[in-house]
C-alpha cells in the first residue's frame, strides 16, 4: 500500500511538471554564465495579507513579470478550519501564493509551480504559500538539479522554517494546522491536522500556514504530550495531541498525556517550555531564551546550483549572534529568528530553533528592520560551482576567513517593506570559508556556593549594629569579672563559679577554650578544665586524693580544712551521717563531727545532773552556770533543800554547804543544829556563757 501511494505521488508530481505554467529556462538566468537570480524571481507576499493576531485574507502576488498564478481563483481557508469555496471536487485546495521552483540544469528547463497536493491523514489540503513576508523581510528560494530542489516554505504565521536538502523524490506535506512540519526519510508520513510539531526530513518540505518550526527528519506527535520517542522504520500515525517527535526514520503512536518518555540515540527534543536546549537537541523550547546549536548536518552533498536555504531574522529579535563553522557550495541554511528572541546563536553544523527563542542555520542572513543589534557582516559568502559539475560540500570548522570575487544582487521588488535583503554570491570555484562573527555581550557569571560577598558584608554590618545596640541598651549590672576586671552587664553575660563572678566568655577551659557555663568543670591548681580534657588528657594524674579513702577524686570534690574529700566520704565519725551541705566541726585530731555529736563528745557536763550542756534549740550558743569551779545547767542551778532558783539577786544567792547548793535560809537551818558563833560567809555565783 505504501509503495502504491508512493507511485501515485511520483505520477502526480510528474503530471504537475508537465502542466507547469511557468516560463522557460531563458528567463531564469542573467547574462552572466553563472547562476544569478533575477529580482523578478523573488516572490513576496502582500504586506497587508495578514495580521499577527487577525484573520487571514487573500494574498496578493507581487506585480512582476514572472508572476505565478494558481489554476483557479480561490480564497485561502479561514483559520478556524472551515472549508472555503476554493476547495475543488477532489479535495485539493489551490493557494493564492505559490513558490516558483527554479531549475538549475538543462534537462529541466521549466519553473515549477507549487500547486502541489498536501496530504494529511488521508485528506488532501491546500498547497502551502512558500514565500511570505513577515515585517517586511523578503525570502529567496532556489532549487537544485534532477528535481532535487530544496524548497523551504515559510508560512505567514510561522516563526521559523528550516529545511534540509535531499536526493529523494518524495514530497511530504504537513497539516494546515500543524505547528511544525515533519517528513520522514523514505516513507510518507502524514501528520495530524492539529499536531504541534512536524519535522521535515530529507525531501521537499512545505510547512503549514500555522507551522512554528520546520526541522529535520522525524515524525509527528501530539501537542499535549511532553515527549515521544520514535525509532520505527514504518509509517505510523501519532496521536493528534502529540507535541514533539524524535526523528529516527519514523514515528510511533504516543500517549496523549505522556509526561516524559526517554529519547533514543543522541537526537533528542527538549520540552516545549525548557529554558536551554541541550547540545544534542534539534528543537528547543518555544519559550527558551537562548539556544546553542550543534551536531546537526547542514546540507546535502548532492545538491547543485544555488541552494534555497535562507536565514530570516525576525522583526523583533534583539540580537542575532552567528557563528559560521562550515562553508557549503551552492547551499545556504535557512534560519528564521523568533519575533521576541533575545539572542540567536547560529551554527552551520547545527540546527536548533524555537518559536519564541531562536533559529539556527547559518551562511545567509536577512536582517530585520526592527532588530536592535545585528552583526555587521551577517551577509555570508557562498560559492557556486558550474552547473554541469557535481557539487560536494566541504565543511570547514575553523578555517581562516577569505573572500573571493563577490557579486551582490539586491532584491528590490519589496512591497510595503522597510528592509532590503542583500545576498552575496561568489562565482569562483572551490571551498568557501565563512567569517566568524562575535557580537559583544555580557553573561552574568554563576555564583559560587554559599553566600555572596555582598551577603557576607551585610551580615557583618548587621552583627555590628546588634552589638552596638546591646552596648547602648540598659542592662542589669552584676559586678566585676574576676578574670578580666570589667563590668558584667546582662544575665546572658554573667557566670558564677567557685564563688566568683565571670563573664560567660571569660570562664572557659584553659585547654580547649570551650565555654564552661552550665557544664561540668574541674579546678586543678587554679586552672579550670572541661570534663573531656580533665578525664582524657592526663589531668587525672594531678587530681587530688580523698583524705578519708585515699582514692583519686574524679568527680565532685569537697574541700574542708585544707583537705579534699569525696562527698560520700565526708561524714561524722560518731553518727556516720553525710555532712555535705550540713554544718560540721572537727577536733584537734581532724576528726569530723556533726554539731550534735561534737557537743555530745566535747561539751561540758553539768555537775548537778551529769549531762552535757548543749546549746538551746535553734541556737549555736551554749549557756551554762559555773560555780565552785563546776558547770551547771541554768535549770540545774537551784537550792537542794527548797528548790529555789538561785541567781545573783538578793535573797537568791547560793550558799553552798559541804558541796551542796543551798539558799541562805536552808544554809542557816543546817547550821542551827550546830549554831556557830559567827555567820558563815556566802560564796558569789558566776554565770558564764560559752
Curated annotation (Swiss-Prot):
Q: Its domain of life?
A: Eukaryota
Q: Name one GO cellular component term.
A: P-body
Q: Where is this region: Disordered?
A: 151-316, 328-372
The chain positions of domain LIM zinc-binding read 479-540, 544-603, 604-673
Question: Keyword set for this entry?
Answer: Cell junction, Cilium biogenesis/degradation, LIM domain, Metal-binding, Nucleus, Repeat, Repressor, Transcription, Transcription regulation, Zinc
Name a Pfam family for this protein: LIM
Q: Where is the composition biased (Low complexity)?
A: 152-186, 335-357
Annotated PROSITE patterns: LIM_DOMAIN_1, LIM_DOMAIN_2
Q: Where in the cell is it found?
A: Cell junction, Adherens junction; Nucleus
As for family, the record states: Belongs to the zyxin/ajuba family.
Listed name of the protein: Wilms tumor protein 1-interacting protein homolog
Q: Which organism is it from?
A: Xenopus laevis
Amino acid at each position: 500500500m505504501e509503495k502504491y501511494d508512493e507511485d501515485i505521488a511520483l505520477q502526480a508530481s510528474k503530471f504537475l511538471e508537465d502542466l507547469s505554467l511557468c516560463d522557460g529556462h531563458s528567463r531564469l538566468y542573467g547574462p552572466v554564465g553563472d547562476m544569478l537570480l533575477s529580482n523578478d524571481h523573488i516572490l513576496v507576499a502582500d504586506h497587508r495579507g495578514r495580521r499577527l493576531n487577525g484573520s487571514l485574507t487573500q494574498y496578493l502576488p507581487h506585480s512582476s513579470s514572472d508572476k505565478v498564478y494558481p489554476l483557479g481563483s480561490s480564497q485561502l481557508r479561514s483559520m478556524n478550519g472551515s472549508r472555503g469555496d476554493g476547495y475543488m471536487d477532489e479535495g485539493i485546495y489551490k493557494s493564492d501564493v505559490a513558490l516558483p521552483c527554479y531549475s538549475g540544469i538543462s534537462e529541466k528547463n521549466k519553473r515549477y509551480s507549487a500547486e502541489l497536493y498536501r496530504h494529511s491523514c488521508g485528506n488532501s489540503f491546500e498547497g502551502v504559500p512558500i514565500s511570505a513576508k513577515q515585517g517586511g523581510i523578503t525570502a529567496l528560494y532556489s532549487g537544485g538539479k534532477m528535481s532535487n530542489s530544496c524548497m523551504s516554505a515559510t508560512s505567514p504565521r510561522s516563526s521559523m522554517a528550516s529545511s534540509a536538502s535531499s536526493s529523494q523524490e518524495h514530497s511530504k506535506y504537513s497539516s494546515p494546522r500543524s505547528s511544525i512540519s515533519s517528513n520522514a526519510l523514505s516513507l510518507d508520513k502524514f501528520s495530524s491536522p492539529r499536531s504541534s510539531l512536524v519535522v521535515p526530513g530529507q525531501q521537499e518540505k512545505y510547512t503549514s500556514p500555522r507551522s512554528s518550526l520546520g526541522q529535520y527528519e522525524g515524525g509527528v506527535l501530539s501537542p499535549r504530550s511532553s515527549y515521544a520517542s520514535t525509532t520505527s522504520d514504518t509509517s505510523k500515525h501519532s496521536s493528534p495531541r502529540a507535541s514533539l517527535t524524535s526523528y529516527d526514520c519514523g514515528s510511533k503512536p504516543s500517549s496523549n498525556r505522556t509526561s516524559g518518555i526517554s529519547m533514543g540515540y543522541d537526537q533528542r527534543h527538549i520540552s516545549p517550555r525548557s529554558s536551554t536546549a541541550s547540545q544534542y537537541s534539534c528543537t528547543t523550547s518555544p519559550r527558551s531564551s537562548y539556544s546553542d546549536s550543534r551536531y546537526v548536518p547542514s546540507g546535502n552533498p548532492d545538491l547543485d546550483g544555488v541552494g534555497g536555504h535562507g536565514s530570516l531574522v525576525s522583526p523583533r529579535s534583539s540580537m542575532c549572534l552567528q557563528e559560521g563553522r562550515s562553508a557549503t557550495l551552492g547551499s545556504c541554511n535557512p534560519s528564521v529568528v523568533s519575533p521576541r528572541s533575545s539572542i540567536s546563536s547560529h551554527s552551520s553544523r547545527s540546527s536548533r530553533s524555537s518559536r519564541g527563542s531562536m533559529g539556527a542555520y547559518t551562511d545567509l542572513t536577512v536582517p530585520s528592520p526592527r532588530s536592535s543589534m545585528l552583526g555587521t557582516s551577517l551577509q555570508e559568502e557562498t560559492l557556486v560551482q558550474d552547473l554541469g559539475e557535481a557539487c560536494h560540500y566541504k565543511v570547514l570548522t575553523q578555517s581562516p576567513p577569505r573572500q573571493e570575487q563577490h557579486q551582490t544582487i539586491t532584491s528590490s521588488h519589496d512591497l510595503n517593506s522597510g528592509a532590503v535583503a542583500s545576498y552575496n554570491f561568489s562565482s569562483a570555484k572551490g571551498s568557501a570559508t565563512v567569517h566568524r562573527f562575535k557580537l559583544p555581550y555580557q553573561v552574568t557569571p554563576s555564583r559560587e556556593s554559599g553566600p555572596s560577598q555582598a551577603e557576607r558584608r551585610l551580615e557583618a554590618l548587621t552583627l555590628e549594629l546588634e552589638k552596638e545596640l546591646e552596648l547602648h541598651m540598659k542592662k542589669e549590672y552584676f559586678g566585676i569579672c574576676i578574670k578580666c576586671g570589667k563590668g558584667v552587664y546582662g544575665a546572658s553575660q554573667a557566670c558564677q563559679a567557685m564563688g566568683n563572678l565571670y563573664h560567660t566568655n571569660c570562664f572557659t577551659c584553659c585547654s580547649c577554650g570551650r565555654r564552661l557555663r552550665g557544664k561540668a568543670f574541674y579546678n586543678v591548681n587554679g586552672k579550670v578544665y572541661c570534663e573531656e580534657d580533665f578525664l582524657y588528657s592526663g589531668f587525672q594524674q594531678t587530681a587530688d586524693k580523698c583524705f578519708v579513702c585515699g582514692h583519686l577524686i574524679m568527680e565532685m570534690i569537697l574541700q574542708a580544712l585544707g583537705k579534699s574529700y569525696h562527698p560520700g566520704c565526708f561524714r561524722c565519725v560518731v553518727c556516720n551521717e553525710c555532712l555535705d551541705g550540713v554544718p560540721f566541726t572537727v577536733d584537734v585530731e581532724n576528726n569530723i563531727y556533726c554539731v550534735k555529736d561534737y557537743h555530745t563528745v566535747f561539751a561540758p557536763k553539768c555537775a548537778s545532773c551529769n549531762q552535757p550542756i548543749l546549746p538551746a534549740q535553734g541556737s549555736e550558743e551554749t549557756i551554762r552556770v559555773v560555780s565552785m569551779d563546776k558547770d551547771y545547767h541554768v535549770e540545774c542551778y537551784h537550792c537542794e533543800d527548797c528548790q529555789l532558783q538561785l541567781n545573783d539577786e538578793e535573797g537568791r544567792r547560793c550558799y553552798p554547804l559541804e558541796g551542796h547548793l543551798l539558799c541562805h535560809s536552808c544554809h542557816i537551818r543546817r547550821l542551827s543544829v550546830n549554831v556557830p558563833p559567827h555567820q558563815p560567809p556566802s560564796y558569789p555565783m558566776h554565770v558564764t556563757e560559752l
